[in-house]
Amino acid sequence: DVSDGDIFGFAMNLDAASGSKTVIVQKNGSTIDTVTIPTANEDNIFIPIAGDTSGTDSILKMNFGGTPNPTPSSAVSDANGFGAFEYSPTIGGVAYLALCTKNLGSNG
């Protein structure tokens, strides 16, 4: 179920050295699913897509750690000090990073 104001988080681990590549899905700061990317697809390009099939007008806002609108009430940064997230991007002891040019190459 999705309600007005729900915040979804997506954390991707595509680091080959870490073992299996995964996508973690969170709703309001709690993990609701972890998807392991099959080996046959691990070299593919991943593009985030969101949609609504309810048949009513909806607004979906995406934030990849940049300057969100509206500003999160908690505004948590990643381990490198970048991003503005409503919930901590550290999940299960893994410090996920904001998708920004300053983080590219810092860990991958």
Task: Give the role of each language-model region.
Residues D1-G108:
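PRY/SPRY (B30.2) beta-sandwich protein-interaction domains
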